[in-house]
From Swiss-Prot:
Belongs to the class-III pyridoxal-phosphate-dependent aminotransferase family. The lineage of its organism: Eukaryota, Viridiplantae, Streptophyta, Embryophyta, Tracheophyta. Substrate binds at residues 199, 335. This is Probable gamma-aminobutyrate transaminase 3, mitochondrial. Keywords: Aminotransferase, Mitochondrion, Pyridoxal phosphate, Transferase, Transit peptide.
Length: 510
């Protein structure tokens, strides 16, 4: 399948993509509130769900929807997804969309995978629930823990603690680290350092760790024990003539200065995503993790790798730690662990931390932390089957095979006059929209450029993530080459339509 946007690119390979600004067809579908609403984090502009007299509309529904503005629930019908099949989802009216975000970075094996469905139904028929408290547990939870430990090869890990989500995993990390330092007689070593623009979840603690203002505003966050250091976004934050390595050195120096300012005896841990996800898909600059890890080791500060998005093949490696030679003390995983078919998350705990936790719990009589659904047998059974599929179908090799075309196909649009940067690796990509191709020249917030682009994608049958004037792609890992081409085509057509709309807005502004 060759769409017009690709034909134009190929026929004008010697010219800049910024010259390709004419829309292939008239577009009259613009966000209903694009001139009124500010650029929004996390929610795609639901501009296509306009007021309707259809009986199956759900405007004013009874759900307090996550990461959704109140006016969206009140004034617009939501996009109601009814079923999924492979890399596609279908709405309640039967419209087909290629799911270019894999739900929320999570349905790595696509929709309607029969082996995962069978694993769930078999376990439901055998043992639908039992807990893991008080030295009681289930066989699926024991088997999954062993499987995860065997798959993680960046360093040896000791134990697995099960949660229901990535947010719960990162929230639990803080309790584990505090418990650990209390056991070692270090009651003041409690502060956490995270990074600006990071995302670690939306509970009180995990939202505090996150470095996105939208998660803090009017929630009285972040918590006082959380500090934030530099975002490692080279394109946006490097100094003139500063190389990536020099940028990484400066950020490591800034981290060390923050540690010294606060007192190394007060800093417990540093948490980082191997590739930042919801903050805009930000891969680290060269030598970044090497230099950061050296600082942490110098001051006896634990490293937590948040692999909720990057684990199980997203980057073309089984874990993000493998890609960047990260040697963490603790790891958070979720999402692709079960391909999102069942809620489950987990923490990988190093042997050193495990030994201290065991010693402390022996003194106290219990390790008093856990959840009703920790190690839920159905979730664990599905996750076990998902991990088998990753290995049996060589999903990592498949990602490595299709990722180059995915990356080069989207990055071919980097010359667009409204694109500042397209960045990513493996099967994850982010696009940042700016004026004059400068990180210091944003579009007016009221234009909602990211939302305009998201609406154009949705109109063409593709779902993406919008975060202000950043958009993200993170499709299922099972994509076929034809599906990769479909995403590239729809991205290109949506981009041209957005360019045309921005030209109109500029003309009106004068």
């Amino acid at each position: 399948m060759i769409c017009r946007s690709l034909l134009l690119l190929r026929s004008n390979a010697a010219s800049k993509a910024s010259n390709i600004v004419k829309h292939v067809a008239a577009t009259g579908c613009l966000p209903k509130y694009s001139s009124e609403a500010p650029a929004r984090y996390f929610s795609s502009e639901p501009s296509l769900q306009v007021d309707s007299t259809e009986e199956n509309g759900f405007k004013g529904h009874g759900m307090l929807a996550p990461f959704t503005a109140g006016w969206q629930s009140t004034d617009l019908h939501p996009l109601v997804i009814d079923r999924s099949e492979g890399s596609y989802v279908y709405d309640i009216n039967g419209k087909k969309y290629i799911d270019a975000l894999a739900g929320l970075w999570s349905t790595a094996l696509g929709g309607n995978e029969p082996r995962l469905i069978k694993a769930a139904t078999d376990q439901l028929n055998k043992l639908p629930f039992y807990h893991s408290f008080w030295n009681r547990t289930t066989k699926p939870s024991l088997d999954l823990a062993n499987e995860i430990l065997s798959m993680f090869t960046a360093r040896e890990m000791g134990k697995i603690f099960f949660t229901n989500s990535g947010s719960e995993a990162n929230d639990s990390q803080v309790k584990l680290v505090w418990y650990y330092n209390n056991a070692l007689g270090r009651p003041n070593k409690k502060k956490f350092i995270a990074r600006s623009k990071s995302y670690h979840g939306s509970t009180l603690v995990s939202a505090s760790l996150s470095g996105l203002p939208a998660l803090h505003q009017k929630f009285d966050l972040p918590a006082p024990f959380v500090l934030h250091t530099d975002c490692p976004h080279y394109w946006r934050f490097h100094l003139p003539d500063e190389t990536e390595e020099e940028f990484a050195t400066r950020l490591a120096t800034n981290l060390e200065n923050l540690i010294l300012k606060e007192g190394p005896e007060t800093i417990a841990a540093f948490i980082a995503e191997p590739v930042m996800g919801a903050g805009g898909v930000i891969p680290p600059p060269k030598t970044y993790f090497e230099k950061i890890q050296a600082v942490l080791k110098k001051y006896d500060i634990l490293l937590i790798a948040d692999e909720v998005i990057t684990a199980f093949g997203r980057l073309g490696t089984m874990f993000g730690c493998d890609m960047y030679d990260i040697k963490p003390d603790l790891v958070s995983i979720a999402k692709a662990l079960s391909s999102a078919y069942m809620p489950i998350g987990a923490i990988l705990v190093s042997p050193e931390i495990t030994d201290v936790i065991y010693s402390q719990s022996n003194k106290l009589g219990s390790f008093a932390h856990g959840f009703t659904y920790s190690g839920h047998p159905v979730s664990c059974a599905v996750a076990i089957e998902a991990l088998k599929i990753y290995k049996e179908r060589n999903i990592i090799e498949h990602v490595q095979k299709i990722a180059p075309r995915f990356q080069e196909g989207i990055k071919a649009f980097s010359g667009s006059p409204i694109v500042g940067e397209i960045r990513g690796l493996g099967l994850i990509l982010g696009t940042e929209f700016v004026d004059n191709k400068s990180p210091n020249d944003p579009f007016p917030a009221e234009w909602g450029v990211g939302s305009l682009f998201g609406a154009e994608c949705e109109k063409r049958g593709m779902l993406i993530r919008v975060a202000g004037d950043n958009i993200m792609l993170s499709p299922p890992l099972i994509m076929t080459p034809d599906e990769v081409e479909e995403i590239i085509c729809k991205y290109g057509d949506a981009l041209k339509a957005t360019e045309e709309r921005i030209a109109e807005l500029k003309a009106k502004r004068g």
